[in-house]
Amino acid sequence: PPRSTRKESSAASDVYKRQGQTTGAQNPHTRGGRRAHGPKVAKDWSQKLNSKQKTLARNSAIAATVNPDMVSSRGHNFDESIRFPIIIDSYTESREGSVEKFDVESLPLQNSTRKFVAMMEGLGLGADLNRAKSGRTIRAGKGTMRGRKYRTPKSILLVVANRDGLHKAARNVPGVDVVAAKDLCAEDLAPGGDLGRLTVWTKSAIKAME
């Protein structure tokens, strides 16, 4: 056959060869070939749940967030003077002789992460931020090669009406999640099925859930 035809046939045959062997590597009928009817990765393992059951689970998880004993038993650290539920509206920061007051929902973008951490420390929740930061470990197994290198403990959950501003401020703080009230579910309030997550609410979020 012409030289070009020999090259094309040789390239096509190389696709089915393994290094150092002459048997096909993708044909299920040959030795060393792929599995004929392997498991399908596209299988959907999700299960349907009634809407009333979802609502009941979410409400039960919300009730657990106002119980200091359940929050403490989950491993969270906070000042004993804190009264639950934790609801905030505005925050005043004093720094370098200047006083700044801002709405929590519309946190200024400049130095927003520093302001967010200072706000949590002012509420008496700084110890839990340090717990999540120091508890960050490298995951065992192949997850380190698949974008899941670190395992970070869950820390504060912040429920807001609009998550745009606070989400950007808290996205680099380990263990902190910001969720809009309309998207709140039991998995956010009780990660892993453990009730009593340390939760901070904004007044706007409370109004949005009414």
Feature locations, PLM:
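Single conserved hydrophobic/aromatic residue that forms the stacking wall/gate
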Residues: P1-A12, Y16
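Generic detector of short alpha-helix boundary/capping microenvironments
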Residues: P1-S4, Q21, S46, R146
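Long, low-complexity, polar/charged, intrinsically disordered or flexibly structured peripheral segments
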Residues: K17-G32
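Extended polybasic, low-complexity segments that bind anionic RNA or targeting/receptor surfaces
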Residues: P28-E210
